[in-house]
Amino acid sequence: MRFQPKTVAAAGLLALCSFAHAGEKIWISLGDAALAQLQKHTPVAVNASVAPSARLAGTEGTTTAARGTEGIHLVQVDEDDLLHLSGAVHRELHRCGGFMFHPSQAEGLATLQRHSGAAKVAAAAAITRPSYVIDQQAVVTPMLNQMQASNIGQTIIDLSNNVNRYYQTSGGVAASDWLKQRWTTLAAGRSDITVEQFTHASWKQKSVIATIKGTDNANEVVVLGGHLDSINQSNTSETGRAPGADDDASGVASLTEVFRTMVANGYKPRRTLKFMAYAAEEVGLRGSQEIANSYANAGTNVVGVMQLDMTNYKGSVNDIYMYTDYTDSAQNTFVTNLIKTYLPTLKIGTDKCGYACSDHASWTAKGYYASMPFEAAMGQDDPYIHTANDTYANTGSQADNSLKFARMALAYMVELGSDGSVIGTPDKTESFTGSLTKNQTRSFGPFKAGVGTFKASTTGTGDIDLYAKRAAVPTTSSYDCKSDGSTSTETCSINVTANGDAYVLLKGYAAGNYSLTVTYKPQ
C-alpha cells in the first residue's frame, strides 16, 4: 500500500491527507518527528514539504513567539498503522504518543487552528489565571507527612493485576469499574464528593472522575489526571499481557494517594478539584480529548491541569523533570516553586517531549493551563513500557519515586484549591452562658471548623478553666490548648489545618458563672 497525499489548507496551517486501501481510515495530527517515523515505518510514502508559514510555535505557555517552531500536520491513515507509528515513536524517538486522534477532518483542522497563537490567546482570555501564591504550608505540610509509598504501591499492584487495561478489552473495562469503586470507598461519608464514569461512545473503557466540590469558589476547577489504559504493542488482544505498572498505573496510583490523603484530613477546597483517570490515552489521547472538549464546550473555567504519566522509574540524575513544550510556562514555574518549597531536597530538570506525548496536550489544545512533570529526561524513562515487562517488580517493587510526585501533586491541588477570587465567608461566632460548681465540667461542640484559627474565650466570676481540642472532647489531661489562670477570664486558640470538628471543655476550679465565646472559620 502507498499513500497518495494531498494538501489540505486551513487558516495557514498545513494538513496532509493520505489514502490507503485497507483498514478503517482515521484522522490524526502529529508533529514533524512523528511524521518522519510514519513515512519511514509504514508501507507508504508521505512527501511533505513544510513551508515556514505553515509551522506552529511550540506551545510553551502563552508567550512563545521567539522560541523554536514545530510543524503540526493532519493526516488520514489506516487505523492499523497506529500501532506501527506508536512503536516507532517509542523505539526511535524514545517517547510516548506523538499523535492525537480526531473523529473527523473538520475536528482535526479545528485542533490545528486552536494551536495557533491567536486562538490560544483568545481561549486563555476566558480562563482565570491563578495568583500562584504559595501560602498553604499549614495545610499542606501535615498532609505530606501522612502520604505513604505503600499505598501507592498497592494501587499499582491492583491495577497491573489485570491482564491488560487496553481501551477495547474486558480488562480495560474491569480496571475502570475497579477504580470507580476504589475512589467511591475512599469518599464514603462526604456529600461534597462524587465519583462517576465518563462514557465514551466509540470504545468500551470508561474514564473515571472524582470531584470534590469547592465551597465558595466552586466554578473554578483544578484537574489532576493520569491515564488508565495500558498497551502491549505486540499484542492488543484480550490475552495480550500489558500490566502497565509504570505506564500509567503509577500516575493513577499517585493521584489516588493525593485523593485519599485529602479525604482522610477532611480537606474542603474553595475551588472544585477533579481527579481524572483517562481512557484510551495510548491510541491518540482519545479519552482526555473528549473530556477536555466537553469542558471547553460547556465553558468550564479550568484554571489548572497537571498530568501524571509515569512516576515510578528514576532513570535520570534529577528527581522530577518539567516538560516545557505544549505546557504553560507560568504554571510550570509555579510547580517548580512548589517543589522547591515543599520538597527542597529534590532535584528538578527540564526537557521536551514533542507534540501530543500525553493527555496534558488535550487540555493545552483547548487553551487551558497544563503541566507535565515526568520521571526522567526524554529517552531515559522506563525501558519496559508498552510490553509485558512493565511490571511493579521492574521498578524495584517499591513506590518511593511515585511518592515524590504524589506529594508534589498534593501541594499543587491544595495551593490552587485553597485559592480563588471569591471572598471567603466571615468567621462564625457562637456564645454560651452558664454556671459551674467546683470540679464540675461541661463540654461544647462539635464545632464544624474550617481551615484557620479556632478561638475560645471566657469571662465571668469564680475560677473556671478552659480547654480545646480537635476531633474529640478534651479532658484536663488531653487537649490541644488550655488556659487555666486564677480567674474566669481565659483564652485558648488552635491552628486548624484541615476541616474537622473542634470541642471545648470548661471546668470549675472554683464555683462561678461564665460567658463562653467561640469563634472559627466555618467549613
Regions found by a protein language model. Name each.
Residues 1-21:
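Gram-negative bacterial Sec-dependent N-terminal signal peptides
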Residues 61, 154-213:
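A non-catalytic alpha/beta surface segment that caps or lines the substrate-entry region
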Residues 113-169:
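N-terminal hydrophobic or amphipathic helices/low-complexity stretches enriched
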Residues 138-147, 160-171, 196-198, 236-248, ...:
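Second-shell loop/turn segments in exported
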Residues 204-207, 238-330:
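Acidic/histidine-rich catalytic neighborhood of metal-dependent amide-processing enzymes
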Residues 317-424:
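Active-site-adjacent substrate-binding region
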Residues 425-443, 459-498, 509, 515-523:
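Surface-exposed beta-strand/loop patches in noncatalytic accessory domains
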Residues 448-455, 499-500:
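Extended extracellular/luminal ectodomain segments enriched in beta-structured repeat modules
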